[in-house]
């Protein structure tokens, strides 16, 4: 059982290093017992200990003066000794213990409170698990929670990965419509057409798409990438969806996506 968190962590790290990379952590999280994982998750929920920061700042470059149009709520969780734990692994273990929906509620509430404290005026991406997206109890809770939110609800963009949404597009589309009724929005992150075909986007009823990083990396070195960016922007315009590019580091790639007219770019 302890191999699961170590395997998940290795996968997370390999994604950060590169597409064909592997990662071996000497001080492996596999040494953490199931009981310790459950205690860490339970502590986060019961004591409201997750820490929220805002990252992945995206700007519109439609004019000479960039305008911030989106940022992402990032969650930091720690064990009893104060050591930071990988959030992906943490959520996976919460799922193992049947606590992921409670964890989502805790984090959403913490994000909303942090936004209120900082008087945030830029839309914020809030990541959710599909377990919560599919839950009627979570939807009922979210409706009640948003009624207490002191800032405009349209600042909230609830997000899942394209991979997660692809497994149950109907459920995510239903959630998007529900969120729209509340006045908030939804965002599909790490999108690529091999995960969800472009022609299926309409049925998801989303407000934002954040492209997978690979699609905006070394764009001119792949004939398919410029074509895809043109197509996705055209489709997005027709469906009134705003497209974001994430972590565009190279100047030639930045110049290209800026020229395409994407809604927001983070660097």
Positions of predicted regions on the chain:
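Short acidic-capped amphipathic helix/loop micro-motif used as an active-site/signal-coupling element
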Residues: 79-84, 108-112, 190
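Active-site core of bacterial EAL-family cyclic-dinucleotide phosphodiesterase domains
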Residues: 29-93
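Catalytic-core segments of nucleotide cyclases and related cyclic-nucleotide turnover enzymes
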Residues: 1-19, 38, 88, 246-247, ...
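Catalytic core of bacterial c-di-GMP phosphodiesterases, primarily the EAL and HD-GYP domains
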Residues: 1, 97-172, 247
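Conserved, mostly hydrophobic/aromatic
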Residues: 66, 90, 107, 126, ...
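Flexible, glycine/charge-rich interdomain/linker segments that couple
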Residues: 13-36, 53, 121-129
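The catalytic core of metal-dependent phosphodiesterases that act on cyclic dinucleotides
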Residues: 145-220, 233-267
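Structural preference for long, well-ordered alpha-helical segments in enzyme cores
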Residues: 3-10, 93-94, 107-111, 142, ...
